[in-house]
């Protein structure tokens, strides 16, 4: 499951836990971007600013369980509802973990083939 789902599951069931193998995993990052061909850049900036507003960021974090980039929200959550929940607190200290990169053309092609197959089913 995704870490946000795991955070929710763990908060509802103390018998569940989140495990990161010592062999490593991928370091995950969520991001908002504005594409170069975006026709509504001002609106996109307004949306990003809205999502980074402390109240909105807290509400979003409480709803989806994902770690917030807003420091005050993160600190509120790790000392509150998600205190001690390992799926909420990212572990970037494991030297065996890595950032997955999918830039190779053969990988992009494979994703395109799989996506086409999924859409066809």
What are these regions (language model features)?
Residues 1-21:
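Ligand-binding pocket segment of bilobal, Venus flytrap-like solute-binding proteins
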Residues 21-24, 37, 101-105:
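A generic helix-loop boundary/linker signal
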Residues 26, 35-95:
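Mature extracytoplasmic/periplasmic domains
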């Amino acid at each position: 499951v995704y870490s946000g789902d795991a955070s929710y599951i763990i908060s509802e069931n103390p018998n569940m836990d989140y495990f990161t193998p010592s062999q490593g995993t991928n370091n995950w990052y969520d991001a908002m971007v504005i594409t170069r061909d975006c026709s509504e850049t001002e609106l996109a900036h307004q949306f990003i600013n809205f999502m980074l507003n402390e109240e909105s960021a807290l509400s979003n974090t409480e709803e989806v369980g994902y770690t917030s980039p807003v420091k005050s929200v993160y600190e509120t959550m790790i000392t509150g509802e998600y205190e001690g929940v390992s799926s909420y607190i990212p572990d970037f200290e494991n030297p065996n973990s890595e950032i997955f990169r999918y830039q190779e053309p053969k990988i992009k092609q494979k994703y395109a083939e799989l996506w086409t197959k999924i859409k066809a089913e």
